[in-house]
């Protein structure tokens, strides 16, 4: 919008605030939940051009002949909810489908780095995503990733962000912070990262962090970087220490990590005064959970059930995030000048959302979007992103000396999505090929570069999955989104990977040469335009298929896709090879050969 148009619109908003222009919409007969003052009292709200222009006992002066009036029927008027940290692409829903999923549950704003998109289509490709977001009843506050790739050592993605690119991004008006600054990059004094952080200081751009299990001197060292927000506390003592040391902490309750019950103890058992410095996020959430449980509204209910007062829980889902991310001039509270993202809630204890207004318009009622949102026409840049030749079964054979009879291997033992330890296993060797043994709970794991850069492929061993047969694979695997495949049969592993290459992305489970379940991800190989309900059914199909090949993990496919993240201790695997996340180096999974 050019300056003259902005000035005209700005003048109109000011006039509307002075009741010199009639409101577009008025909410009457409601109880305002004032998250700034922790009060609840009768109030009316006037809205003009998507902005709140008045919050008073009586806004009759703002009503014109064409003003729409909503009777709140004594329901509670609550600010729209804010997800304080989310890799929205991990839902496998496009931005449009994701908005359809979460807006009826009261989520009207999200904080995201859109880093999964960047790994595939680059920063320039985000222009298409921002166009899509502009048409949605949901706001995205974008934090530009501190660098890409995040992995140490650096793995392969389609497009890299370094400090030079970051310096340019920090000048953009749509960049609200530096996203996901991992502690290891600070600890190792990575100069490119440090340049970005110094630029952020100069440009007054807030830095958002990622520091799991950082306490004591590790935390002190990390905080010298200028980080102000962190979403990685594994227990309530860690959360408390971080708040005491000046961090705004975001409690994560995702589809794969459930930290709310433990983290909330810092408020309910230790010090309730810290609550205003704590907020919520879902980080990585799938469609099944959104459809079956809700989104931020679910977290509010969990907090209330854990003993948090409803007002406090609502603050954690609204104003706390807004203040932590310095966007409280736009969202997080119901006050003049703020965006008109508003919920009508019938019961604060049950936190039952009856109506959602976003950008000043009623968009959802009783948990359902008022009308389906049209999907944009997708450009060619978002399709055909799997640039990889077909593979063979022999690509999934781990070769050692031809005269070897057995090997001792170090497996990446999964004890949950964000807990991975080393476990030693002994495997037999036949004709120089290590034999994968399901009876010993060992599977082969491989990551294949899929951007046409170098053709990298890694091989390693993993345990804890109880696979009995077959394989499963995905082109959506944060934060690099290369192809990851796990299996106990080379032929099935090759079939799984080739299926993803041929079908331009998705997730697949195979066994005995047959495809048991396939979930298509045609947009950048990471997301889909189907409805949330449709994707939830597809996810359930993948889950049942992975259970059919023996896995007893809660969500095997989702858990597997996190194996390339090197910020999660202790071990990972990328297209470069097996990674010791503590030493930040590659390691050979073969320990001994006999």
Swiss-Prot record:
Cofactor dependence: Mn(2+)
EC number: 3.5.4.2
Gene Ontology molecular functions: adenine deaminase activity
Annotated family: Belongs to the metallo-dependent hydrolases superfamily. Adenine deaminase family.
Cited PANTHER family: ADENINE DEAMINASE, N-ACETYLGLUCOSAMINE-6-PHOSPHATE DEACETYLASE
Reaction equations catalysed: adenine + H2O + H(+) = hypoxanthine + NH4(+)
Superkingdom, taxonomy of origin: Bacteria
One of the GO biological process terms: adenine catabolic process
Pfam family, one: Adenine_deam_C
Name of the protein in question: Adenine deaminase 1
EC supergroup of this enzyme: hydrolase
Keywords noted in UniProt: Hydrolase, Manganese
Record InterPro entries: Adenine_deam (IPR006679), Adenine_deam_C (IPR026912), Amidohydro-rel (IPR006680), Metal-dep_hydrolase_composite (IPR011059), Metal_Hydrolase (IPR032466)
UniProt KW Signal keyword: no
């Amino acid at each position: 919008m050019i300056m003259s148009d902005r000035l005209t619109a700005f003048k109109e908003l000011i006039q509307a605030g002075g009741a010199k222009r009639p409101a577009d919409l008025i909410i009457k007969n409601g109880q305002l939940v004032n998250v700034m003052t922790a009060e609840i009292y009768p109030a009316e709200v006037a809205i003009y051009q998507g902005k709140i222009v008045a919050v008073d006992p009586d806004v009759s002066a703002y009503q014109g002949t064409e003003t729409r009036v909503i009777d709140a029927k004594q329901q509670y008027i609550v600010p729209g909810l804010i997800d304080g940290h989310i890799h929205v692409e991990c839902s496998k829903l496009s931005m449009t489908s994701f908005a359809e999923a979460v807006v009826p549950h009261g989520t009207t704003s999200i904080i995201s780095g859109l880093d999964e998109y960047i790994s595939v289509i680059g920063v320039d490709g985000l222009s298409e995503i921002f166009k899509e977001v502009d048409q949605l009843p949901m706001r995205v506050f974008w934090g530009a990733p501190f660098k890409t790739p995040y992995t140490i050592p650096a793995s392969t993605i389609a497009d890299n962000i370094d400090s030079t690119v970051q310096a340019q991004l920090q000048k953009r008006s749509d960049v609200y912070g530096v996203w996901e600054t991992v502690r290891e990059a600070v600890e190792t004094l990575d100069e490119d990262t440090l340049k970005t952080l110094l630029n952020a200081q100069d440009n007054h751009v807030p830095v958002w962090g990622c520091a799991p299990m950082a306490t004591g001197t590790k935390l002190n060292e990390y905080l010298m970087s200028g980080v102000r927000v962190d979403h990685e506390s594994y227990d309530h003592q860690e959360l408390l220490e971080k708040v005491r040391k000046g961090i705004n902490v975001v409690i994560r309750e995702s589809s794969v990590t459930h930290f709310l019950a433990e983290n909330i103890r810092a408020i309910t058992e230790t010090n309730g005064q810290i609550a205003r410095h704590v907020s919520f996020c879902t980080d990585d959430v799938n469609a099944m959970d959104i459809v079956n449980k809700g989104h931020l509204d679910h977290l509010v209910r969990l907090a209330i059930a854990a003993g948090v007062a409803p007002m406090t829980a609502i603050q954690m889902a609204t104003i706390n995030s807004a203040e932590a991310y310095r966007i409280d001039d736009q969202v997080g509270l119901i006050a003049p000048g703020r965006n008109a993202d508003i919920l009508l809630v019938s019961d604060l204890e049950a936190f039952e959302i009856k109506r959602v207004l976003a950008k000043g318009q009623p968009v959802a009622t009783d948990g359902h979007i008022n009308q389906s949102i049209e999907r944009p026409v997708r450009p060619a840049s978002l399709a055909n992103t799997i640039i990889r030749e077909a593979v063979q079964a022999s690509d999934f054979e781990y070769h050692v000396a031809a005269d070897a009879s057995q090997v001792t291997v170090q497996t990446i033992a999964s004890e949950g999505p964000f807990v991975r330890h080393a476990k030693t296993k002994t495997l037999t060797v036949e004709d120089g090929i290590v034999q994968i043994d399901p009876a010993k709970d060992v599977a082969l794991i491989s990551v294949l570069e899929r951007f046409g850069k170098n053709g990298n492929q890694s091989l390693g061993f993993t345990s804890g999955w109880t696979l009995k047969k077959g394989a499963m694979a995905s082109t959506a695997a944060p934060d690099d989104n290369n192809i990851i495949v796990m299996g106990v049969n080379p032929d099935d592993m090759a079939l799984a990977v080739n299926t993803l290459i041929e079908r331009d992305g998705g997730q697949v489970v195979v066994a005995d040469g047959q495809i048991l379940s396939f979930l298509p991800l045609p947009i950048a190989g990471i997301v889909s335009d189907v409805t949330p309900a449709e994707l939830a059914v597809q996810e359930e199909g993948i889950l049942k298929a992975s259970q059919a090949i023996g896995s007893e993990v809660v969500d095997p496919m989702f858990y597997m896709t996190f194996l390339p993240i090197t910020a999660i201790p202790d071990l990972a695997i990328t297209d470069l090879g097996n990674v010791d996340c503590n030493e930040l180096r590659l390691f050979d999974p073969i320990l001994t050969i006999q």
